């Protein structure tokens, strides 16, 4: 073969190789990754890998590592900004709570839950956080029989003034005689819902059956209406701000007469036959059933478990010493509350006013049992 023929054949061969190669790298399957086997499943996306390898190599003959690093830095920057944004939506205990401000009292439990006393919380930080969350707080109260005319109006009027000021509140009022409910003018962000409940012959049964009623209403509608729910006795009156520092997953109230007493002296249910039984040597605090709360799901758990215990006691023909309160204390022994309110939040002035009570949020009303209870 002459020289001219060899040159032509060589040129054809080179052209063919170049054409095949070019077609290959531009095909969906084309990639340099065929030369090794990767165990990384993300490396099997050949089209993505081809886009990474080839445009850079043919960009003025220089692979664009710098651009790759800049893209990585941008991604890291976005992740860092997202973390910072997430941090601003989280409220950590140490952001608002300082137990050292009240060294003379118990401010932290053995399970590291805060005991909220006046002076231990930063109200500004809490208000700023919850304002952004746009929360709704429910307050449920029972007024049965003569409790309606003796206590209900003053309770709701004072709650309208002091309870969760600046936040949306729904008052759930459970009564056995709806026409007797007084008209109460509420402030902005407050609404009032009245529900009729079945009356019971004994006040003990009213207290115990309230656990069932609370649970039923949470399931029926409250869980969809509020972010937090408090259940309170009606024979109390607010006299100072009861605010967002009290909000938590599950919230228990220290009983004013028992917060300095040794647990073995608490009036727990001590009979083994009762579902509310707590043996000597056990117990953390004595909790008052006049106030408890938390998220709707947690309050549902509290009321359902307490009512189970009440039904079991009825089946065994026994009644716990302090009825629903005994079962509440048993519940919180087994399921520790995430936050505890000091006696400042529910105080009895008959005790006096010791130095550790800096302010009284919600004092007890005078207990006129002879006027409001059918069976004393």
Swiss-Prot record:
The conserved DXD motif is involved in cofactor binding. The manganese ion interacts with the beta-phosphate group of UDP and may also have a role in catalysis. Residues 1-4 are cytoplasmic. Binds 1 Mn(2+) ion per subunit. Its cofactor is Mn(2+). The chain crosses the membrane at residues 5-25. Disulfide bonds: none annotated. Pfam families: Glyco_transf_6. Residues 26-376 are lumenal. This is N-acetyllactosaminide alpha-1,3-galactosyltransferase. It comes from Alouatta caraya. Belongs to the glycosyltransferase 6 family. InterPro entries: Glyco_trans_6, Nucleotide-diphossugar_trans. Substrate binds at residues 142-147, 233-235, 255-258, 267, 367-373. It is found in: Golgi apparatus, Golgi stack membrane. GO terms for molecular function: metal ion binding; N-acetyllactosaminide 3-alpha-galactosyltransferase activity. The active site is at 325 (nucleophile). It is a single-pass type II membrane protein. Its EC number is 2.4.1.87. The gene is GGTA1. It catalyses: a beta-D-galactosyl-(1->4)-N-acetyl-beta-D-glucosaminyl derivative + UDP-alpha-D-galactose = an alpha-D-galactosyl-(1->3)-beta-D-galactosyl-(1->4)-N-acetyl-beta-D-glucosaminyl derivative + UDP + H(+). Pathway: Protein modification; protein glycosylation. Keywords: Glycosyltransferase, Golgi apparatus, Manganese, Membrane, Metal-binding, Signal-anchor, Transferase, Transmembrane, Transmembrane helix. PANTHER family: GLYCOSYLTRANSFERASE-RELATED, N-ACETYLLACTOSAMINIDE ALPHA-1,3-GALACTOSYLTRANSFERASE. Mn(2+) binds at residues 233, 235. GO terms for cellular component: Golgi cisterna; Golgi cisterna membrane; vesicle.
